[in-house]
UniProtKB/Swiss-Prot annotation:
It holds the Pfam family Complex1_49kDa. GO terms for cellular component: plasma membrane. The gene is nuoD. It catalyses: a quinone + NADH + 5 H(+)(in) = a quinol + NAD(+) + 4 H(+)(out). It is a peripheral membrane protein. Its EC number is 7.1.1.-. It comes from Brucella anthropi (strain ATCC 49188 / DSM 6882 / CCUG 24695 / JCM 21032 / LMG 3331 / NBRC 15819 / NCTC 12168 / Alc 37). NDH-1 is composed of 14 different subunits. Subunits NuoB, C, D, E, F, and G constitute the peripheral sector of the complex. HAMAP family: NDH1_NuoD. This is NADH-quinone oxidoreductase subunit D. PANTHER family: NADH DEHYDROGENASE [UBIQUINONE] IRON-SULFUR PROTEIN 2, MITOCHONDRIAL, NADH-UBIQUINONE OXIDOREDUCTASE 49 KDA SUBUNIT. The lineage of its organism: Bacteria, Pseudomonadati, Pseudomonadota, Alphaproteobacteria, Hyphomicrobiales. It is an enzyme of class 7 (translocase).
Amino acid sequence: MAETQVRNFNINFGPQHPAAHGVLRLVLELDGEVVERVDPHIGLLHRGTEKLMEAKTYLQALPYLDRLDYVAPMNQEHAYALAVERLLGIDVPKRGQLIRVLYSEIGRILNHLLNVTTQAMDVGALTPPLWGFEEREKLMVFYERACGARMHAAYFRPGGVHQDLPDQLVEDIGKWIDPFFNTLNNLDDLITPNRIFKQRNVDIGVVKLEDAWAWGFSGVMVRGSGAAWDLRKSQPYECYNEMEFDIPIGKNGDCYDRYLIRMEEMRQSARIMRQCVDLLLGKERVGPVSNADNKIVPPKRGEMKRSMEALIHHFKLYTEGYHVPAGEVYAAVEAPKGEFGVFLVSDGSNKPYRCKLRAPGFAHLQAMDFLCRGHMLADVSAILGSLDIVFGEVDR
């Protein structure tokens, strides 16, 4: 009897797979149930964001940033606003900085709650997402009360934030923090010691530190491998250098370590939020929330009713926009998924000449083949969950 040639088996994972978190398509080459090769096919959500931004004024380009990592929108706006501010050479008043930091940390918790609970769901735990989404709903309401939108906020503007927060809202955010620790402890008790969750995540998708640097990882992916690299501490922006918080780091670099770091980061974010709330209700209770330069920040409604000059400024800002001095700048923030950077090139006009977006998820997804080789097919979704990928920013 003639021998039959045994070939590896190719399957498609996605593009509409429940564990793929969006429009991911992986072409997997399997030897039995062991993964030999992973080929991510991206671009299914490509919208040409970077090109579209070149046709808009600096203010009009801002909402595109919300639509990248749409799980934590304000963190992307933050990087863009910082880049424009550096080119313009303007600074943000203290109250505006505190509001930005407060909402950036809310974004981090929004992101980690979604990731940790869906990571648990990917390996078969159905309760955590229900608990996580209950807390996310409350945070979305805080987003809505600040700017009117639950997701695409367009709240951070170059020069500060769009409008001040009412005291009642800041108080409500303060009241939310302590009960949130209870929710986190409940999640912790449910998932962390769970035997099945551990078996599915411990020693899966291990990344050594030198590999993490070589692949261009950032955020949790680097901290899970043992480096205390967090832009909020290593290259502080806004008022992070005045905040007290710790950077959790892992030592095994596996999926379980990355999960534990995200859990601890939510606690640290809540600590930062508590400090912001205390300052916003105390020492910084009154004060401007955006730069006073009316050539960049539009005047207030009441001012426009009284002053013709203010009306003209407002009209010019929303039709022509402001001209940014020629130059180039790179601004990066510690977004929930890693280092989100904006490389902005200005030619002196009212529109960006080029805006390159450095999405952390893009660098993490490219290592999918490296991470999954030799693992079982079932581990692919566990590894994917621990990478924390959102396709808005990968495909741009």
